[in-house]
């Protein structure tokens, strides 16, 4: 695939960094770009991580400002004063309406301008967080919509879609970057460097790592 280019939607978290490294190994560093979105997220430390990782990996990064989302929607991920809650049923209060739809739209606009057809997103529905825009059916629908809207043959790839978090850690290990992902990425919703170990994102990350390391020990 060395003659093809890819654009990775990149937050600086575990999943998107895993996807970025996989893309570099698949397409070649010179054929990969990253796009990052500032949308008023309370865990803005991830933006700093994203910048550092992109630079460290030698990948061109573009950061787009979508903070206008604060004007039209409210959720715990964009409100520092709101408590982060996990819904027993329904959508968690950290869900940002339309976020992944906007990310894919702006990524596609940018990609077309760069002559890029492959867009990679680290969304996953296996360890389902309750986010409707992380489902495969949504991504496939958005792929069709973008192709029709821009008359362009985009291919949206979601390599983690059916992986558990433990399997995502296993993938990082297979690529030789498990320690890099552990030490350099940021996932915490509360914006705490190293993780708060209490928010849903931290719990999922740590549980998945523990499961993978335990299974590795048993082999």
Curated annotation (Swiss-Prot):
TM annotation in the entry: none
Catalytic activity as recorded in UniProt: 7-carboxy-7-deazaguanine + NH4(+) + ATP = 7-cyano-7-deazaguanine + ADP + phosphate + H2O + H(+)
Needed co-factor(s): Zn(2+)
UniProt: ATP binding residues: 10-20
InterPro entries: QueC, Rossmann-like_a/b/a_fold
Origin superkingdom: Bacteria
GO annotation, biological process: queuosine biosynthetic process
EC numbers, comma separated: 6.3.4.20
Enzyme class: ligase
Pathway(s) where this gene product acts: Purine metabolism; 7-cyano-7-deazaguanine biosynthesis
Keyword Ligase: yes
Stated role: Catalyzes the ATP-dependent conversion of 7-carboxy-7-deazaguanine (CDG) to 7-cyano-7-deazaguanine (preQ(0)).
Record-linked HAMAP family: QueC
Name of the protein this chain belongs to: 7-cyano-7-deazaguanine synthase
Organism: Neisseria meningitidis serogroup B (strain ATCC BAA-335 / MC58)
Lineage: Bacteria, Pseudomonadati, Pseudomonadota, Betaproteobacteria, Neisseriales
